[in-house]
């Protein structure tokens, strides 16, 4: 179903995207292959806007002339253009090409005529420096000419907004793949996104109309938002989906805002800034949150702002605790939780660190405790390694839900989908594996059935496991076990009648929350240290989620006899080979 989106009625998405990408033929030499997108992406945006505005071009110019002395004229011009953007320049692509001697000056004049929302996009693309490179290499005229040809036509009479969105998405994918790992940091492939959307929407009642809000706190090029919107409309096309996103990288923000404009959405919902230190959606609440924030990245740049907000307690986003400064991914989880509506649901990608890093009482453990004790942790899905373009490590989808169905209350589902993939024919960066449609259906089935089970695929080696746990399973009490200082007579030294602890003999034990601490102490400690006691003032509660331990499968080692026999066989084969070799030499 996902792939069908690239075969729309009236226009073949991949074919059109290929035709546009082939404009790169004019860039060979002055631009390296991984730089083609620096020209093609902004030019695609500009040409789409140009072709949309062309029918109302004269009307906009007339309205501009009559209203240009007004303090505020945006409303008049957007009404005249019929879009949320406009252009007041007298130039079109045709008239630009009619004057090749002044192509740079006229093209810059044309770009300066765009409305402020488009100007913001071009500034974030840093397109001015790209124009200079094209001028210096005598390619600007050729590029404009190529985009003004039939293959570069992007008017709404031939290409619907949704189709143009998919064309642009395909171009973004090509750019990301050609750029390798750096761009991959901002691009999550569709197979992963579709799994996340299917999990988010698995229990959704979308039979009625209305409005649904979707938020991505680290949206990159906004592919997660567009895929989520697509999935919701597949279930009910009458639902109005409003997308919101924030991004800190200028070029990927430009792509995201362009995509929103191209699709006919509200570009004001795409906002620039650092989510951790410059929250652009303070006070907002969303039905769905889907995100792949950076992991393993420090938050030193945001430290001052984050700690100041943490000091506000429940008035801020980071009251439960702060992770170590070297890894800020849990801060994004807290940001998402603060923006989840009472019936909200979130799917967010993390690496393995948030599962277990930090001792009892530490920031990471307190964040896990906050999530689990509020019964918001719905499921964690382990993906295969080599799923992303820029990292080969294991990754996990955390599913959080503030409105769990009754049968999921007080429970957490762990799904090991690390064997649920198929190898790609050709890797892209470090992405060597794909979640196929069938694999995605298996994981969605496991999530929906909510039981201890193993689901097997049609091909050998493809399966996913599901296990259900009580919330308390992941909690423990960390107790401090003391033993006394012994005097020369072998008896404990006393102070005010109490034995004094020997710091050299001090130890700790993690007692599962489901166990009685005193019973554990009697069973596990006193038989080996009868003079020990618990310093109950130092007891702390911690939480960890040891996925590997829960899904560990014991492999019976090969019998020693079989190993020895195999060695003897190999030795005999080597001896025979040597005899044949030297026998021929004689």
Features from the language model and the residues they span:
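Conserved Class I SAM-dependent methyltransferase catalytic core
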Residues: 26, 35-36, 40-45, 322-400, ...
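Non-catalytic, mostly N-terminal accessory regions of nucleic-acid modification and defense proteins
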Residues: 1-204, 269-280, 382-385, 409-416, ...
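Conserved S-adenosyl-L-methionine
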Residues: 183-291, 295-307, 330, 351-353, ...
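Short acidic (Asp/Glu) and glycine-rich catalytic loops that position anionic groups and cofactors
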Residues: 266-270, 311-316, 345-354, 418-424, ...
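Flexible, glycine-/basic-rich loop-and-beta segments that form/coincide
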Residues: 389-483
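Hydrophobic alpha-helix feature that most strongly marks membrane-spanning transmembrane helices
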Residues: 233, 261, 265, 294, ...
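Feature representing long, continuous alpha-helical segments
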Residues: 226, 254, 291-293, 330-334, ...
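Conserved catalytic motifs of ABC-family nucleotide-binding domains
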Residues: 298, 302-326
């Amino acid at each position: 179903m996902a792939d069908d989106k690239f075969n729309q009625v009236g226009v073949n998405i991949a074919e059109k995207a290929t035709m546009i990408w082939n404009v790169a033929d004019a860039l060979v030499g002055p631009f390296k292959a991984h730089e083609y997108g620096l020209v093609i992406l902004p030019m695609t945006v500009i040409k789409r806007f140009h072709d949309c505005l062309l029918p109302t071009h004269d009307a906009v110019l007339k309205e501009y002339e009559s209203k240009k002395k007004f303090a505020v004229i945006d409303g008049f011009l957007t009404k005249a253009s019929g879009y949320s953007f406009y252009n007041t320049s007298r130039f079109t692509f045709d008239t630009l090409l009619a004057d090749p001697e002044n192509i740079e000056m006229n093209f810059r004049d044309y770009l300066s005529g765009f409305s402020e929302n488009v100007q913001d996009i071009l500034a974030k693309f840093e397109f001015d420096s790209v124009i200079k490179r094209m001028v210096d290499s005598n390619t600007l005229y050729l590029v404009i000419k190529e985009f003004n040809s039939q293959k570069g036509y992007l008017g709404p009479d031939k290409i619907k907004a949704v189709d143009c969105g998919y064309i642009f998405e395909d171009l973004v994918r090509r750019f990301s793949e050609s750029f390798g790992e750096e761009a991959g940091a901002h691009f999550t492939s569709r197979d992963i996104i579709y799994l996340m959307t299917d999990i988010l929407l698995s229990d959704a009642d979308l039979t009625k109309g209305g409005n649904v809000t979707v938020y991505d706190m680290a949206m990159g090029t906004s592919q997660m938002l567009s895929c989520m919107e697509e999935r919701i409309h597949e279930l009910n096309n009458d639902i109005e989906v409003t997308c919101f996103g924030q991004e800190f990288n200028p070029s990927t923000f430009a792509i995201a805002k362009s995509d929103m404009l191209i699709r006919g959405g509200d570009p004001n919902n795409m906002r620039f800034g650092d989510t951790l230190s410059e929250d652009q959606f303070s006070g907002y609440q969303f039905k769905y949150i889907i995100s792949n924030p950076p992991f393993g990245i420090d938050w030193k740049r945001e430290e001052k702002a984050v700690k100041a907000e943490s000091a506000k307690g429940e008035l801020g986003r980071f009251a439960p605790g702060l992770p170590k400064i070297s890894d800020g991914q849990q801060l994004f989880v807290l940001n998402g939780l603060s923006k989840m509506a009472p019936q909200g649901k979130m799917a967010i990608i993390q690496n393995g660190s948030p599962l277990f890093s930090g001792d009892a009482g530490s920031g990471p453990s307190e964040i896990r405790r906050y999530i689990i004790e509020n019964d918001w942790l719905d499921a964690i899905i382990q993906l295969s390694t080599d799923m992303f373009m820029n990292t080969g490590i294991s990754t996990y989808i955390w599913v959080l839900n503030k409105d769990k169905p009754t049968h999921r209350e007080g429970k957490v589902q762990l799904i090991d989908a690390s064997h649920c993939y198929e190898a790609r024919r050709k890797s892209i960066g470090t992405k060597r594996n794909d979640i196929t449609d069938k694999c995605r259906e298996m994981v969605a089935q496991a999530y929906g059935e909510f039981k201890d089970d193993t689901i097997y695929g049609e091909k050998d080696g493809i399966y996913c496991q599901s296990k259900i746990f009580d919330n308390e399973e992941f909690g423990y009490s960390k107790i401090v076990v003391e033993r006394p200082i012994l005097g020369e007579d072998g008896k404990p030294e006393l102070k005010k009648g109490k034995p004094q602890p020997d710091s050299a003999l001090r130890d700790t034990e993690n007692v599962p929350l489901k166990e009685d601490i005193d019973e554990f102490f009697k069973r596990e400690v006193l038989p080996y240290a009868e003079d020990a006691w618990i310093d109950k003032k130092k007891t702390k509660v911690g939480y960890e989620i040891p996925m590997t331990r829960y899904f560990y499968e014991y492999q019976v080692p090969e019998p020693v006899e079989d190993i020895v026999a195999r060695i003897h066989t190999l030795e005999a084969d080597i001896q025979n080979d040597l005899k044949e070799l030297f026998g021929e030499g004689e």
